[in-house]
């Protein structure tokens, strides 16, 4: 088996995790207590869903997941929520003090206290696997736990499980909406270790997803639940081929191989289609070309940057539902002929496609309509540098005055770490600039 362990860190990671596991359970017909009426081969871990769920002798299906936070309230919600019986109590780790939006508390002082119990639990989860494939890590980099403890765990995973893939689903601060003044500090410090210790990171951003909810689903005032359900559809689409047997399956390592041209350039944009409310769905038919076109529109990207400002290096299209390869090939061909979607000159093919016949599942009472087919795109586009430059600018304004820095230094950090992380991010922006710019130099030689 090629198992995957999911690690949910901090409030954002845990709440996205709740939505994901709720959706996985619905997709596989697993009840909130972990029982699965349709599973006839109990105790035999041969089914595709066993990549994400382990089975006990009593027929319970337990997520291969760890939830960790430095304060108890969010984990307590899981412990009292509808899926409380799904998880093993030892998979839900909380501590008594908060990281207080401070990267240094999450990474040095408070995080250190909890990192060993987390790694012990991860080791138990890993021992329970026959062929561990990798980790999915969910966190946000604006707060203290997601950024600080998230980085610490990633660093330790690199040491203990160096050869395993690590995919991050990371929520970055939004341009307009802010939940903490020190977000730019936490994000820059955290990105420093994401560059080093993850293989692929999918960038998400609340503001972009708010806009999608308002525009496509007609939700006046979206809540985090609305956002997380949308995020969970993306993550579910990416992991479908790991959890179901499909026509063209895509392995986790295949994402890496196909999307990452250079090790540092592994920050991806994601988009999903069709995002459509129940009222509208009755009147529209979504063909493969239509949904394929819509994932390339800037309005469907789940991070605040415009892919038209950049060039694509590669993209992964994951179709699910009533889709045949012939339609996909035609849709991809028409995208390639469009002038709006620009690829870098050194990557002419640029498309990786996966198809899974399992149609998309929706949460009962949720916002999305049930559709016959859907597509999720993960793309490597140079425009993602816009996200970094925006955070850098805010970082520089604060750091020039050394504002709030004493809170970090007081928790055992050194000021040098700020400038080191900032320089690393500047280098990353430069890298993106260079991979996109290789075109112009060649053109000059031709004329």
From Swiss-Prot:
Q: Could you confirm whether the keyword GTP-binding appears in this record?
A: yes
Report the active site residues: 254
Question: What reaction(s) does this enzyme catalyze?
Answer: GTP + H2O = GDP + phosphate + H(+)
Alphabetized UniProt keyword annotations: Cytoplasm, Cytoskeleton, GTP-binding, Hydrolase, Magnesium, Metal-binding, Microtubule, Nucleotide-binding
What PROSITE patterns has UniProt attached to this entry?
Answer: TUBULIN (PS00227)
The yes or no answer to whether the keyword Nucleotidyltransferase is present is: no
Superkingdom is Eukaryota
Residues the record annotates as the site (Involved in polymerization) are 447
Entry EC number(s)? 3.6.5.-
- For the ligand (GTP), the binding residues are 11, 71, 144-145, 179, 206, 228
Give any GO molecular function from the UniProt entry. structural constituent of cytoskeleton
Q: Which Gene3D superfamilies did the record assign?
A: Helix hairpin bin, Tubulin/FtsZ, C-terminal domain, Tubulin/FtsZ, GTPase domain
How is this protein annotated for GO cellular component? cytoplasm; microtubule
> Which BP terms from GO are recorded?
microtubule-based process
Where is the protein localized?
A: Cytoplasm, Cytoskeleton
Q: Which cofactor does it need?
A: Mg(2+)
- Which amino acids does the record list as binding Mg(2+)? 71
Q: How does it assemble?
A: Dimer of alpha and beta chains. A typical microtubule is a hollow water-filled tube with an outer diameter of 25 nm and an inner diameter of 15 nM. Alpha-beta heterodimers associate head-to-tail to form protofilaments running lengthwise along the microtubule wall with the beta-tubulin subunit facing the microtubule plus end conferring a structural polarity. Microtubules usually have 13 protofilaments but different protofilament numbers can be found in some organisms and specialized cells.
Return the similarity comment.
Belongs to the tubulin family.
Instruction: Give the protein name, as stated in the record.
Output: Tubulin alpha-2 chain
Taxonomic source organism:
Eleusine indica (Goosegrass)
């Amino acid at each position: 088996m090629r198992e995957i362990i999911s690690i949910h860190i901090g409030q954002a990671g845990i709440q996205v995790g709740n939505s994901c596991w709720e959706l996985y359970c619905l997709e596989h017909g697993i009840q909130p207590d972990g029982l699965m009426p349709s599973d006839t081969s109990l105790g035999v871990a041969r089914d595709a869903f066993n990549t994400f769920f382990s089975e006990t002798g009593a027929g319970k299906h337990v997520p291969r997941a760890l939830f960790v936070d430095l304060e108890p309230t969010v984990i307590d919600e899981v412990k009292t929520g509808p899926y409380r019986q799904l998880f093993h109590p030892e998979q839900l780790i909380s501590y008594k003090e908060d990281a207080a939006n401070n990267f240094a508390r999450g990474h040095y002082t408070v995080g250190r206290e909890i990192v060993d119990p987390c790694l012990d639990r991860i080791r138990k989860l890993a021992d329970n696997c026959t062929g561990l494939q990798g980790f999915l890590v969910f966190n946000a980099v604006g707060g203290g736990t997601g950024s600080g403890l998230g980085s610490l765990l990633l660093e330790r995973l690199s040491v203990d499980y160096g050869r395993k893939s690590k995919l991050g689903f990371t929520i970055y601060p939004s341009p307009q909406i802010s939940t903490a003044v020190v977000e730019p500090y936490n994000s820059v410090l955290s990105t420093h270790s994401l560059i080093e210790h993850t293989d692929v990171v999918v960038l998400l951003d609340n503001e972009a997803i708010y806009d999608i909810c308002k525009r496509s689903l007609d939700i006046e005032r979206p809540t985090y639940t609305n956002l997380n359900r949308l995020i969970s559809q993306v993550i579910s689409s990416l992991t479908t081929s790991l959890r179901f047997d499909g026509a063209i399956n895509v392995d986790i390592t295949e994402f890496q191989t196909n999307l990452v041209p250079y090790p540092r350039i592994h920050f991806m944009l994601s988009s999903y289609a069709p995002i459509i409310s129940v009222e509208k769905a009755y009147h529209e038919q979504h063909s493969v070309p239509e949904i394929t076109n819509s994932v390339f529109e800037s309005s469907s990207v789940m991070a605040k940057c415009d892919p038209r400002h950049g060039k694509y290096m590669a993209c992964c299209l994951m179709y699910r539902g009533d889709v045949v390869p012939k339609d996909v090939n035609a849709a991809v061909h028409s995208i390639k002929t469009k002038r709006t979607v620009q690829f870098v000159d050194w990557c002419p093919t640029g498309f990786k496609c996966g198809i899974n016949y399992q149609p998309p599942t929706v949460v009962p009472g949720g916002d999305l309509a049930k559709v016959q087919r859907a597509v999720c795109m993960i793309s490597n586009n140079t425009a993602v540098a816009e996200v970094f430059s925006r955070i850098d600018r805010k970082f520089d304004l604060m750091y020039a005055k050394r504002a709030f820095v004493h809170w970090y230094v007081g928790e055992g950090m050194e000021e040098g770490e700020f400038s080191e992380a900032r320089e690393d991010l500047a280098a990353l922006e430069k890298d993106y600039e260079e991979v996109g710019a290789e075109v112009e130099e060649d053109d000059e030689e031709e004329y």
